[in-house]
Swiss-Prot record:
GO terms for molecular function: nucleic acid binding. This is UPF0102 protein RL0336. Belongs to the UPF0102 family. It comes from Rhizobium johnstonii (strain DSM 114642 / LMG 32736 / 3841) (Rhizobium leguminosarum bv. viciae). NCBIfam families: PRK12497.1-5. Disulfide bonds: none annotated. It comes from the Bacteria. Pfam families: UPF0102.
Length: 122
């Protein structure tokens, strides 16, 4: 496989990831969440979606897979640590940080199915 083939595969994966994040964001909005950030980057890592519902800040990892179990399993312990570290940086910048609760969710995006929202996944 040549470099251009790998680049095309990578571009396709990035595009699929972005589309999945937008689908997950719309899904969360329909469930009453307010989307604060998509693909929030910090020096410690990236958070796919930061959402809020009342005094609850939700940090969401989005995974596009063929099944729910594969999506949940795709969020490694290392990724969980990076997301938690990045969320700590985000929380530190919030004026109402003291009253915010936090939760870490996963949204699984699967072909031909509605998204599946795993609350408090890690």
């Amino acid at each position: 496989m040549g470099d251009s083939d790998l680049t095309a595969i990578r571009r396709k994966a990035l595009r699929r990831g972005r589309i999945s994040e937008y689908v997950a964001a719309v899904f969360l909005m329909l469930k009453g969440y307010r989307i604060l950030a998509l693909r929030h980057r910090t020096r410690l890592g990236e958070i796919d979606i930061i959402a809020r519902k009342g005094d609850l800040a939700v940090f969401v990892e989005v995974k596009a897979r063929h099944g729910e179990a594969a999506a949940v399993d795709a969020v490694s312990v290392a990724a969980q640590k990076r997301i938690r570290a990045a969320s700590d940086l985000w929380l530190a910048r919030q004026a109402d940080q003291a009253r915010l609760s936090q939760r870490y969710d996963i949204v699984a995006i699967m072909p031909g199915r509605l998204p599946r929202h795993f609350l408090d996944a890690f």
